[in-house]
Amino acid sequence: MTIWVDADACPNVIKEILYRAAERMQLPLILVANQALRVPPSRFIRTLRVAAGFDVADNEIVRQCEAGDLVITADIPLAAEVLEKGAAALNPRGERYSDATIRERLTMCDFMDTLRASSVQTGGPNTLSPRDRQHFAAELDKWWLESQRKK
């Protein structure tokens, strides 16, 4: 089992939670990004730098992740691909992706794209709240416990 992080877009506060979790769970944590990242020294934490470009990091995560792994991403198409491989996917707000939530999110993305194409300003997501961080940490622990039961 490995935790993969779509690190270019992952908030720093979530990365900090993941660093502590990797140590506690003694699980490999791999942060994939197209830029250099600073991570704490650990035998469990490493970075994987990929070339800059559209979906390069996403494609590398899909290529390397396996069934039973966890992928941290806010990217819906990436989440859909890793679910197909048998991995779990969790967004930085602590929402666990499923086939149903992926379909719902893709529909919403299409709708928002239509609004933006019509020159409607839609804004971006809200900043992460302390509640979001707590929810993420709780869902991460829940995934860990579920994966331990399957062993």
UniProtKB/Swiss-Prot annotation:
Pfam families registered for this protein in UniProt: DUF188
CDD domains, per the entry: PIN_YqxD-like (cd18720)
Protein family: Belongs to the UPF0178 family.
HAMAP family xref list: UPF0178 (MF_00489)
Protein name: UPF0178 protein YaiI
Lineage, uppermost ranks: Bacteria, Pseudomonadati, Pseudomonadota, Gammaproteobacteria, Enterobacterales
